[in-house]
Amino acid sequence: MTRDKYDFLVLLDSIQGIWYNTNLTRKGNIMKSFETLNPMQQQAVLHTEGPLLVLAGAGSGKTRALTHRVAYLIEEKNVSPWNILAITFTNKAAGEMRERVNGLIPQGADSVWVSTFHSLCVRILRRFIENLGYESSFSIYDTDDQKTLMKQIFKEREINGKLYKERGVLGIISSAKNELVTPEEFALESKKDGSARSQQIAELYKEYQVRLKKNNALDFDDLLVKTVELFESCPEVLDYYQERFRYIMVDEYQDTNTAQFRLVSLLASKYR
């Protein structure tokens, strides 16, 4: 990313943030809804500075507290919606959260970035993936695409289909990516292990990634892996999103894997 492009994006975001801050006309109304929360939920809402982990059982109102916290930040703390990121695990949950926030604060709520981990990463990568040697028009491979690609690799390498199954190999690769284990790291561990099977899978993992990049494609797990790689290799891009997302909330945080945890940690490391 060129410096001019970075400066332009920062300026654009600043202008939008100022616009929303000067158009919040319902400040104080959120407190009426706040009174319907139980004491523990209220504590979670009022804690606006520094890390906070909310642990509670299913159906206890964690998501409700999170959406009220978003509204409280905007209406009572005068935080720009532009600076708030709320992450969920499913598109359905993201849609429900948007509806809840809109119900609490119609003014400016649309500018709160509510999304799943993967949709967040897609938007970031569409903008900056050229820094990693991909084109911004990259394809996202679904399960069928992945299986077709792996079948091609199996055929060309004359892999015994009785000993190795495409679905099984892809599952192992997916698990490795979720733990941010690169093909090189996987190969190193397989050599230490001494297993011929693990070494074969390491070769398949390596070739699979080579083919994906050649096709200008990412699989679902790559969306997280490549966003983490982007942030770690391009400090100016990370800084841009750290400035953008000064308040980050993750629904069902206890379910995050290593890649998701690393992504959130990088984004939140500047403002804690």
Label the predicted regions.
Residues 50-68:
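Walker A/P-loop
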Residues 34-48:
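N-terminal pre-P-loop "Q-motif" helix
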Residues 243-258:
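SF2 helicase catalytic motif II
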Residues 3, 8, 14-28, 49-52, ...:
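A basic/glycine-biased coupling hinge at the interface between accessory DNA-binding modules
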Residues 32-36, 57, 156, 160:
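Short amphipathic alpha-helical boundary/capping segments
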Residues 32-36, 52, 62, 72, ...:
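Conserved RecA-like helicase ATPase core segment
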